[in-house]
Amino acid sequence: MTFGIVRLYRASDPQKAADVTNNHLDKHNRKNAYIGKSITRPNVFILASRYESLSQKLEEEEENRNANLVGNLGGGEFLNISLIKPVNSTNPGKALNSNSYLSVFGGENSNVKKTVELAEKINEIDGQSLLDKGIATIQTVAITGIPMNTTFIWHAIETPETAEKVLVDGITEFHSEDGLKIVREAIPLWTTKNRGFFQTVRNMG
């Protein structure tokens, strides 16, 4: 049972927060954590953790508390915390292992089930070609949160050159015409649309 927690954290001391978190993860040999730094607000981080069981999550949380991890970050606040599950991935379990950048798009959605089905079709059509261009795709849906009807598309991007193209021109430039038809069908299902773009601080794996 794979699930995850995604946290958005605004740090008072970004470098200290990154260093303390990285050192803590290294000390405990954690391979299941990704950290990205916003390219527009460099004091904002996305912190994603992947778990294979609830017991793993509880064990790691206890390690965090015992080390006073949050207290040692130098101050800041969590802007959002969500429990999520991956439902579509072109590189299951490895998408965040080697990317240099991460683009995340999504928000509240009027029909999460249909969006998941459409995203699966898009991956069937274009998933491999995007992988060949250095872009892995993950879709996540919320398990908890307010609101809960949210789903996000993550694009894990291998190189700065590709990241620049995605940032400026959008991911649609990398899709085929058949894939774009489904993308255009899916986009209106999001009732709120948010996008974040992050530079990798720490990869999973």
Q: Model features per residue range: what roles?
A:
Residues M1-G205:
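Short S/T/G/P-rich N-terminal loop/turn motif that feeds into the first structured element of a domain
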